[in-house]
Amino acid sequence: MTPHDKVMYIIQQLELSDSKVARAIQKSVSSATHKRMRLRDNKFTDEDYQNIRAFYLEKLRSIENLEEENTP
């Protein structure tokens, strides 16, 4: 699976908009859109994959920690 395929999988699984992807990969919305649509052969890079993965894993961990905080 290429980095582009991995990012596309994350986008599909989390139903992310281009603006949310842009924030996670620290690029402009138009850049995220071009990469998603593969315009002018733009693709998500390994750096994009690492950024989006880290961004959303951190968010999921904070959600998971909510359960631990409520444990007596």
Predicted regions and their residues:
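Recognition helix of helix-turn-helix/homeodomain-like DNA-binding domains
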Residues: 27-42
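DNA major-groove recognition helix of helix-turn-helix/homeodomain DNA-binding modules
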Residues: 46-63
